């Protein structure tokens, strides 16, 4: 009986975040923390799932994965879709053993790490290896179709193809990977857990996503220009649009009467809900611009412009954080943390901070000098926030 394993890291969302679904450039960093999935063949034709802190689950073959507990849907969904895509079936039963150091509900892609690790194990077990970015795309399908979370492809790409110690530029149209970009020597980006749990399947994220696609459709209708991605526009182009073309907000019913639906299969427009469409579509356009500037700064950094470049880079993080709040993905705890970092300032080795991933809690990304870590620990204790920083 064969026994194989797959392993994949969580990721730190440096810039980009929820702009991925609008075709933005994002900058992602793999973590040291990983998830390992061990799959063992058994003679009994059944599926068994074990995970630390969860009750074991056993299913006969053919059970719909959507009938399983939510935590099981991630690995089972990967198996279900892998079997269909690769036309492969195990010879007997399978036992899945999951262990992970990636914290859950903290915005560092514990789900993507689990999906990618599962698919890597299945590659070994079946002898069928994915080419290109197919593994990441199948992992995203498991989360979208089986788990029911409307995430973009960013997390899975970062977990599958990121390089340790560097930022991976990903142009989410849908999966163009750039060359990794390193931070200057002595400077680190880390995750500071807020202690506030979040989930991509929750309403604020879904509302922001739907609002972005509604905004895109309104722009297309008002300008008579077809857009594949909203981020094909520049921030100045969006700002120049009139209230008539791109209103500040409108209800789902008014939008449907004006435009019908959106071209995003993962978004549902609720007729009675009011959507802040201008902010929702402006954020990814501006975030794409921030990510482009960040890559340019990091690739051109030198001893003579180091501090100035880091100061501008930090301001991009602060702008991104404010953008999250504008689309309903902020929270008081992360606002307090970011302002705490800002108060310490560049003179003490703190360049910038932002809420990351899906927002609404989770993890704050901090850009700082490595020597400033003790000061961040003191700030965390002062604010009564966690000190278990994520690297």
Enumerate the language-model features and the residues they cover.
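DPxDG-like acidic metal-binding loop motif
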Residues: 30-33, 108-128, 365
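Hydrophobic alpha-helical hairpins/lids featuring a short glycine-rich hinge
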Residues: 61-91, 95-102
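Glycine/threonine-rich beta-strand-loop-alpha-helix active-site module
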Residues: 125-172, 176
